Every structure is written in C-alpha cells, then in structure tokens.
C-alpha cells in the first residue's frame, strides 16, 4: 500500500497498551457507567488487551450484556463496595461528582481517570486518526473502518456506535494504527494525540460546556491544528493550516462529489480529486441521505491521504454495512417502514426527515424522544419549526429520566407550541401498544415511521412497537 507523506509501514506491531500505567495489568480497572456507548468500547479494548476490567452501571443494556458475555464483571447499581479491589477508577463527564463510587475512590486515594485520560493513554505512541464533529462522526468513523477492513490496514477501532459489521463499538487490531471517534461534547477531542484529525461538521450544540458558538469553533480549530494533518468540510468556517489540510464538499474543496444518485438503499456518486482525478461510480451501501455522502467524502479523504487505492476505497464503501440506530430499518410491514435514528439536534432531525422524504411520497411520522431539557431550551424554536415538517409527531418523555426539568421545556410545552402554530397532528405517548395501534390505524403502504432519539427508551419502544404492529398487520 502506497503511503502519502506518512510512513505507516515502519510502525511496530504492538502487544501492549497503556504504556504509562502498565503496572496495573495485574490489578483492576473499574469503569463507572460501563454500559455507555463510549465507555463500553474502552472496556472491551482493555479487556481484549489482557487488562482486568470491571464496571458498574445504573441499569443493564445491550452493551452491558455484550461485555458480560466477554467475561467482564458488571455491577448493576452504584455501590462503594464495587470498587474495593480496583486500583484505577474511570469515569466520564456524565457521572456526577457525588457518585458514591467516585466519592469512595477519592476518599481512598485511588487513581481516578476521566474517560479522555484513559483514552489518551490508550493512544500514546500510536498512529492515530481521530474523527470528531457535531454530527456524522460515528458514521464517518464506521466508513473509514470499512475501507480499512477492505485494504491492508489492521487498525484498532473505537467508535460511538455499534458497527453492524463488528456487532460492537470496538475492534482490537494488530498494528499501532488507531481509528477513533473523538467526542466533542466535553472537550475530549482536545486530549487526543492525533496524527490525522477529521471534522465532519460544526454546529451550535453543547453550549452548556462551551458557552458560545465562537468557543465551539475555537475548540475545533485547536483540534485540527495540533495534528500533523487535518481533513475538514469546505464550509466549516474555522482557522486552519491550508498547507497541512484537505477539504471535502459538494461545491469546492479537494475532494468533491458529483452525479449523486439516491437508490433504494444505497447512494451512487463520482468523486473528483484535486480537479484532475476521478473515482467513478462509487456505491455507498446501506445509506440514505445527502448527509451520508458528506460522511463518505470525509472517509475517502482519509483513505486518499493514506494512499489507499481507488479499488479498495470503492470496495470498502460498497461493503459498508452501516451503524445501528443510524437510519436503521427495524421493520417493513406491508410497505410501512419503521426506521430508527439517533438524531437529537435539530439539524440532525432535519437531515433524517429529509432522507426519509427522499425515498417516499407517503407520509413521514416522527416518534421523537427529546434529549435533555437544556437542549430543548437552547433550540426550542428550531425544534418546533422542524417538527412541523413531519406529517405527524408523537412525543415521548425527555431522556434521560433523571434529567432535571426546566420550566417551559417539557414535551407538553413542545406540543402546546406546535398546536399554537397551527400544527395539530401531535400526541404525547410512551406506550408501545398505544403507538402500535395509532400507526396501524394511521399508515398506508409507502409511509415511513421514524423513531428518533439518542436514549435507550426510544430504542426499546421502537422494537416493542414493531413487534406489536407485525401482530396487528398480519
């Protein structure tokens, strides 16, 4: 494989991780919130690298089940006794400072690491490709992984979603090449020692952490400028070093898409590279929507930078199997498609709705679980504007359940605002049986029902509803 500007072929195969804390290999690393999508990936990589890992979570989920099947001990519920044998305790920003395990670790002078710290340790002395962005980073990382899997790059992959090809959110490779999704929500991306950084998009999310949109853009600028090479959208609007970067997009940039054709479950397009080379008839499987083409362009940019051949790029995207909960078909019942999507920012919900509209002339019904009251407050008007673009909207309770309510930002407030703006096609529901009856009575062949949200409840609701509708429609 030809390499541009980097000499990956000289990287030494590695049999150990966590260079700075390798003395703990006979001890125990305890991960609080181990069932989270990011934490479970780290836990699996550590376990597969022969570290003794355990963890705890408030409740069981699919990630917990997967880890337990690997032999990782997971405690359900947080308790001081859970960490009695642990030498290192790992937590994320989602864990409150008064969490009993975190407090106990602090009082007993145990080594406490933030998720970003242990991730940085995992990546120390590796060749790192870090993908970040306000939206699209999981899908983009998955596309890069698929290209790697169909070339000669045996990379370790850590991603914030379940890759259908892996049935996991991580993969331990045999080389020193690490492909990771870098979380921007709490600034984790700034701790990542990356060789290549990728930005998929930038919007005004996570204002509670950053303060202003300018602060968000500044953080992304820091992220790309500390790497050896950066890949970013052509319209991102941040400071960057043009001599060490590559841009992708539809109108300008080094890597551009043209002749885009949306098929039933794939997208076909051509790629123009620096105005003098074209990859024709690229087929991106298991994807719908123009935003996925943008993700693919970012992935192709990484591949081009690493010298991966056109044939390997095309093969990787043709064989792309998608990511769970990213416009994922749950069921097709007599022509009514039930689709699940992780969208939770207004821009993401709009992209998901647009993707659905691109493949049907029927109705599009949104069953939406808002994520956090603060996000509703920050984007209330945007949510109302976009929800009114659906044919019908069913609102479910805000996730997570323990999130502190903010006056004027509940789902009843959203419903009132929709109605006051003349949109009466809205209900509040949280029962799969009631939702299944509504869908059965209100849909026709070619209609699409979108289950939208990042929480675990909407995912459970989607599967239960699909099963009930299948019974009714038989």
UniProtKB/Swiss-Prot annotation:
Pathway: Cell wall biogenesis; peptidoglycan biosynthesis. Its EC number is 6.3.2.8. GO terms for biological process: cell division; cell wall organization; peptidoglycan biosynthetic process; regulation of cell shape. It is an enzyme of class 6 (ligase). InterPro entries: Mur-like_cat_sf, Mur_ligase_C, Mur_ligase_C_dom_sf, Mur_ligase_cen, Mur_ligase_N, MurCDEF_pg_biosynth, UDP-N-AcMur_Ala_ligase_MurC. It catalyses: UDP-N-acetyl-alpha-D-muramate + L-alanine + ATP = UDP-N-acetyl-alpha-D-muramoyl-L-alanine + ADP + phosphate + H(+). GO terms for molecular function: ATP binding; UDP-N-acetylmuramate-L-alanine ligase activity. It comes from the Bacteria. It is found in: Cytoplasm. One of its GO terms (cellular component) is cytoplasm. It holds the Pfam family Mur_ligase_M. ATP binds at residues 133-139. SUPFAM superfamilies: MurCD N-terminal domain, MurD-like peptide ligases, catalytic domain, MurD-like peptide ligases, peptide-binding domain. Keywords: ATP-binding, Cell cycle, Cell division, Cell shape, Cell wall biogenesis/degradation, Cytoplasm, Ligase, Nucleotide-binding, Peptidoglycan synthesis. Cell wall formation. Belongs to the MurCDEF family. PANTHER family: UDP-N-ACETYLMURAMATE--L-ALANINE LIGASE (PTHR43445:SF3), UDP-N-ACETYLMURAMATE--L-ALANINE LIGASE-RELATED (PTHR43445). This is UDP-N-acetylmuramate--L-alanine ligase.
